Amino acid sequence: MASGGQFPPQKQESQPGKEHLMDPSPQHASPHYKPANKLQGKVALVTGGDSGIGRSVCYHFALEGATVAFTFVKGHEDKDANETLELLRKAKSSDAKDPIAIAADLGFDDNCKKVVDQVVNAFGSIDVLVNNAAEQYKASTVEDIDEERLERVFRTNIFAYFFMARHALKHMREGSTIINTTSINAYKGNAKLLDYTATKGAIVAFTRGLSLQLISKGIRVNGVAPGPVWTPLIPSSFDEEEVKQFGSEVPMKRAGQPYEIATAYVFLASCDSSYYSGQVLHPNGGAIVNG
């Protein structure tokens, strides 16, 4: 497992990055993980499930018995999406339906509705919604962030969470769960990722507020705030020297691997977390944060 200073210098030119081009490849599976049918019979929809944390979440959900659907960016993430589909087909339980991948730009309400409709048409319901897709871009100053980019980042990173939730909830029953991916940056700030950080703070507030709205319906809403994790967003966001040192800033002095984060989603999606709602888990390499 790479530690700080052990990633080869590398750079990808477009967001959200491609996992199959990364060196080393992110680790989506732990050799020590033991499935226990925690999600048997459930339908899970994961946005941005083609790579990184999303891929690992999909994989672990499939191991736990869930039928899985995920979204990806068409024309950019097709290869990663196909690799994830093959991975899920091999991991799924015999009584789970075949996984599906849905190409979508989630920054627009109509597209989110189409995604939800496609999942419901295929599988009948949604038991677990994971809002995970995101974009991030470096900027040295607030003046460098123009209106077009600001709107794009907010559409993908927080508008889509609202859109997906409002449409998925029509098909979610008591006992269902929503899990939102936020970030350590929401708690510590990040001068280089100002607009991204603002959206991640909004996701924390959205998670808390929505949990209060839905608690009477028996639907739980929680979040996960990863620290530095080796995903395609990293070589597509930072320069080669920053990539080389990625993860060295946290107490464990290394970046996390996707599988080290995905188990938090399994916990929050399953009945093991039945007394959790409005909470955020912090798999971040030992960084101390408030919240």
Swiss-Prot record:
InterPro entries: NAD(P)-bd_dom_sf, Sc_DH/Rdtase_CS, SDR_fam
Region (Disordered): 1-35
Protein residues bound to substrate: S183
Pfam families hit by this protein: adh_short_C2 (PF13561)
UniProt induction comment: By abscisic acid.
Tissue specificity note: Expressed in embryogenic cells, somatic embryos and seeds in the later stages of development, but not in non-embryogenic cells and mature leaves.
EC numbers, comma separated: 1.1.1.-
Keywords: Oxidoreductase
Similarity section: Belongs to the short-chain dehydrogenases/reductases (SDR) family.
Functional summary from the UniProt entry: May act as a short alcohol-polyol-sugar dehydrogenase possibly related to carbohydrate metabolism and the acquisition of desiccation tolerance. May also be involved in signal transduction.
Name of the protein described by the UniProt record: Glucose and ribitol dehydrogenase
The species this protein was found in: Daucus carota
Origin organism lineage: Eukaryota, Viridiplantae, Streptophyta, Embryophyta, Tracheophyta
Gene: CAISE5
